[in-house]
Design a protein with these regions (language model features):
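Asp-based, Mg2+/Mn2+-dependent phosphohydrolase catalytic module
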Residues: 1-8, 110-217
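N-terminal helical cap/lid subdomain that shapes the substrate entry/recognition surface
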Residues: 3-98, 109-111, 122
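Hydrophobic residues in well-ordered beta-strands that form the structural core
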Residues: 20, 104-106, 180
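Residue-level marker of regulatory loop/turn positions in helix-turn-helix DNA-binding domains and
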Residues: 86, 105, 136
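A short helix->loop->beta-strand "cap" motif at the edges of active sites that frequently abuts
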Residues: 99-100, 176
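N-terminal-biased segments
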Residues: 101-105, 119-120
Length: 217
């Protein structure tokens, strides 16, 4: 897994990467879809890794305020924290990283992201890039570029952990190295990058210059 390579920082997607929330999200989105005459089976595959406002805007529904609808969905998700759980090994792995060498980069709004991270029992990042921090969400690279900038590193020296095609596309466009997290996937959706089912066996070595290298225990 990226053997013989050192990184300046690690950037984590949130949902599906360091914590599990997809069941709750899909239930809320399915209810919203049905209330607007949309087949949930058609909508749900499009929501992963993408800002809610962009998902709704793409539907081009007449008379719908995408910002207002996205806020309603966000508030419903904030109220539904039961069943949020960490990806195995995520808490220990994140805890082994220097606090100024990692960030969370999510398409969720900040309030929702902070609630989910807390509910999962994960360390709260010093740097959290959320939906409202960018003008264009994933697939665009802006979120990962901003995270690297705030950490004071080159994004090309960063390692991104992602689980969704939109996030992988964003990280690729930014020029970062990528590891797929496939905890809740039968198989990786792409073979372009290394993949891991969990963080249980991942270990990090911190060099004197705060460079990070990873290996499987």
């Amino acid at each position: 897994m990226h053997s013989n390579k050192e990184f300046a920082a690690v950037l984590f997607d949130m949902d599906g990467t360091i914590l599990r929330s997809i069941g709750i999200a899909e239930c809320i989105w399915a209810g919203w879809a049905e209330s607007h005459g949309i087949d949930p089976a058609v909508l749900l595959p499009t929501i992963h890794g993408v800002r809610a406002v962009e998902t709704i805007s793409r539907l081009d529904l007449p008379g719908i305020d995408a910002e207002a609808e996205a806020e309603r969905i966000t508030q419903a998700e904030i109220a539904a924290m039961d069943g949020i759980e960490p990806i195995p090994g995520a808490a220990a792995f994140i805890g082994s990283l220097p606090t100024d060498r990692w960030a969370v980069v999510t398409s969720a709004p900040r309030a929702l992201a902070e609630r989910r991270i807390e509910a999962a029992g994960l360390p709260m990042p010093a740097i959290l890039i959320a939906a409202e921090d960018v003008t264009v969400g994933k697939l665009a690279p802006e979120c990962y570029l901003l995270a690297a900038q705030r950490l004071g590193v080159l994004v090309t020296a960063g390692l991104v952990f992602e689980d969704a095609p939109a996030g992988v596309a964003a990280a690729e466009a930014a020029g970062a190295s990528i590891t797929l997290v496939t905890a809740y996937q039968e198989r990786p959706f792409t073979e372009r990058h290394p993949a891991t089912k969990s963080f249980d066996r991942l270990r990090v070595r911190v060099s004197p210059g705060n460079r990070l290298s990873l290996w499987l225990a």
